[in-house]
Every structure is written in structure tokens, then in C-alpha cells.
Swiss-Prot record:
Matching NCBIfam families: L6_bact (TIGR03654)
Role noted for this protein: This protein binds to the 23S rRNA, and is important in its secondary structure. It is located near the subunit interface in the base of the L7/L12 stalk, and near the tRNA binding site of the peptidyltransferase center.
Protein name from the UniProt record: Large ribosomal subunit protein uL6
Matching HAMAP family: Ribosomal_uL6_B
A GO biological process held by the record: cytoplasmic translation
Organism: Nitratiruptor sp. (strain SB155-2)
Family the UniProt entry places it in: Belongs to the universal ribosomal protein uL6 family.
GO function terms (MF aspect): rRNA binding; structural constituent of ribosome
Gene Ontology CC terms: cytosolic large ribosomal subunit
Disulphide linkage map: none
Pfam families reported for this sequence: Ribosomal_L6
Subunit structure: Part of the 50S ribosomal subunit.
Keywords in alphabetical order: Ribonucleoprotein, Ribosomal protein, RNA-binding, rRNA-binding
SUPFAM superfamilies: Ribosomal protein L6
Length: 178
């Protein structure tokens, strides 16, 4: 077990953190992130650090201990730095463009796919790279996964939408009979 919950989360300058009603509320300017922890872990703020401790000694309490520490760390990191995912489009005639509050994808279907950009997410397109940015790690990952799901990469030619750092295991095509 990694015991990640033992490590306190540092509160950077410019970020205000409050604990109320089973929630950790972090604010920076007009951005707000909330992490709901209920009564599963004990949370306190000690000398500009958020400290977590498990409620009991059972396995589930220890699991929640690390989970809520990681969620809180992601919320604070999102407010200070933000998160980014990049997708790459491969294929003849495959392209993407941002039009207003929608992402228009042409992925070899008879019609373009219009994906509405959610609140708090910025999408930019440069050649065949789609960049997704936001301050909520879960939302950024979800949007990237949804866009990828429209045309996942196929194993023969590698056509489709893939993450920039993703490796596609290629298959050999059929060979002619001798």
C-alpha cells in the first residue's frame, strides 16, 4: 500500500481553502473547486497544509484516506497550473475545427460530428492536434475520452483519434495465398 494519504497537501499562496459541511472548498480568483469527503476521513488545516487522517482502522477507511487526499491535491493543482490533454487525428480527410462553442470533427463519416464544449473547458486545434485545457482533471480527461471515442484508432493503419503519447499496437494485414 502506498500510504499516499499520509502526505499533507500544501496550500499555495493565492489559494483560499475552507472546510465546511463535509466539503473542502478551494478558491483562486473566480475559480472554485469542491471536494466532498463526508464522514469518511478527518480533514484539518495545519500551518498552510491540509492534513488527512482515516476515521477508522478498517481497509475501506484507509482506501478513502488516499483517494480524498489525491482528489484534493488534483483540485488545488488544477487551480494553480491547470490540466491539459492532447489528441492527435490521423487519417485522410480527417480534420477538426472549433466553431463557436462546438468542436466540429470530420472523421470519415457521411456527416460532421458536432461536440458541444462543456463549461470550464478550452479546446484549441492546431493542424491535426486537439488540445483540451481546464482546471478540473476529471472533466478534462472525460472530454478527451469522449472525443477519442468518436473514432478510436484502428490497429491496421492507425487511422482515428488517439492521445499524443498513446502507442497503437499494429497488426499485419492479410497475406495473399501462395
Amino acid at each position: 500500500m502506498s500510504r499516499i494519504g499520509k502526505q499533507p497537501v500544501a496550500i499555495p499562496s493565492g489559494v483560499d481553502v475552507k472546510i465546511e459541511n463535509g466539503k473542502i472548498i478551494a478558491k483562486k480568483g473566480n475559480l472554485t473547486q469542491e471536494v466532498e469527503f463526508g464522514n469518511r476521513v478527518n480533514v484539518s488545516i495545519e500551518d498552510n497544509k491540509i492534513v488527512f487522517s482515516p476515521v477508522g482502522e478498517d481497509k475501506q477507511s484507509k482506501a478513502f484516506w488516499g483517494t480524498y487526499r489525491a482528489l484534493t491535491n488534483n483540485a488545488i493543482e488544477g487551480l494553480t497550473k491547470g490540466f491539459e490533454k492532447k489528441l492527435e487525428i490521423n487519417g485522410v480527410g480527417y480534420r477538426a475545427a472549433v466553431k463557436g462553442k462546438e468542436l466540429e470533427l470530420q472523421l470519415g463519416f457521411s456527416h460532421p460530428i458536432l461536440y458541444p464544449i462543456p463549461e470550464g473547458i478550452q479546446i484549441s486545434v492546431e493542424k491535426n492536434i486537439i488540445t483540451i485545457k481546464g482546471h478540473d482533471k476529471q472533466k478534462v480527461g472525460q472530454v478527451a475520452a469522449e472525443i477519442r471515442s468518436f473514432r478510436p484508432p484502428e490497429p491496421y493503419k492507425g487511422k482515428g483519434v488517439k492521445y499524443v503519447d498513446e502507442v497503437i499496437i499494429r497488426k499485419a494485414g492479410k497475406t495473399a495465398k501462395k
